[in-house]
Amino acid sequence: MKKDILYNLALFFSFIILLGTSNGQLIPRNSDKPEYRDFTSANGKTIKALLIDKTEDTLTLKLPNGKSATLSCEKLSIEDQEYVRKWDKEKELFLTQCKTLTIRELLEIRGYESFKFTIKGNHIFVEGELNGNKSQFMIDTGAGSTVLHIEAAKEKGCKVGPLDQVIFGIGGEAPAALTEVPEIRLGQAFIKDQVLLSADMFKDIPNARKEYDAILGAEFMSKMRAVISYKEGRIFFRPDLIDNDDEIEVPDVPKYRFFKTKDRKTFKGKIAKKNATSIELAIEGQNKNLTLPLGRLTDEDQKYATDWSPQREIFLRQCRGLTVQDILELRKYQSFEYKRLGNHIFVDGKLNKKDTRFMIDTGAGSSVLDVNWAKDTGCEVGPMDQVVYGIGGQAPAAITQVPSLTMGNAKFENRQLLSVDLFKRLGRGLKAYGAIFGADFMRETDAVITYREQKVFLQTD
């Protein structure tokens, strides 16, 4: 087989030259409480009220005495017409009634399947299956493609070809083999019949623990519409949307559902209220509610009832138009649109007040600077007497004092990082980016990465 040089980023490397910029913008938020305000009519009269609904031509106001009134938008002052135009009912409901819901709850309500991940040395690991065999995977947004550890690939039933391919990592190049992979699975999320690369992931790494069987790269994350949440310690997938370009953000939800009991009775209704031991069902077509002990329900319906809350119900049925981006920005996250080329994701920021492009890399336990860019931006770079390890072996590195690194409102000051020659093979004139934004800073800012919306979110306050 002809030897090909495959420029896969394995943990740290990209050869893409990017143009253009992307800047994060904070979205103005409403008050977290119902906003009673003075509305002024076109003839100058004022009334204190709460905006609760609107159509294209009318608005509905709730008055302090509890009554409501509907009037034409044209009867308001120009300023108040503009307020009504910008007002968003779904966002208002979310802010006032759904803010106690966690990111996990909000995404699972939206149909995402979630997996708890563990963090070791700032790396993210999840459990899954490789050809039906229990396996450990490292989540690496910096890896353009999924790569298997060659020993695990052989042990778990993959067909491994000759080592006639080459991949590149922080330590240089390493031989790799084209590998036929019947299946990689995490819960309901899976890929089948793929040809991927295998390599000795731990070669020349001292005391390597061989803690994982494969790196799940950006192409897998993109296919599964992944959301990675450091605060929740979870990764979320939408396996139902694989290969579906005409995707629906939120599946339709019927007004009523079937509740089944352990004595094989079925009731069609919806939860009206609940307490610690029972639920009260509003039965379809009946005026009287039915009370059922939780212990009488099937295990599946017990879980549904236990998870149910009025806030979840409001969000599911009345906030359907909100995107994941809307939800996170309303939760005080700052968003950054990233550039995604070659499966890698990049965001713009500043290193010592100089514009810098960062690669977002969950596989990098610590943020790393390109040594030449670090010098160009005024960082204090020490001697190259440190060593970093990765695919391809080891590479020299320098302890570097960083006065400031900023991304939007996220600011990291007086930090000590490592600098490495990230582009040694390309020459100094060919730089794809100036630094790697690693898991250390992402944990510090409770980062969320969304592949569907191509956004990175940081919580800066």
Regions found by a protein language model. Give the residues of each.
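Bacterial N-terminal signal peptides that target proteins for export
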Residues: 1-10
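Bacterial N-terminal signal peptides
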Residues: 9-20
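Cleaved targeting-peptide boundary
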Residues: 23-36
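Pepsin/retropepsin-fold aspartyl endopeptidases
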Residues: 26, 74-461
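Short aromatic-glycine motifs in intrinsically disordered, low-complexity regions
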Residues: 34-42, 257-262
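Basic/aromatic-rich interaction segments and small domains that mediate binding to polyanionic partners
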Residues: 57-68, 279-289
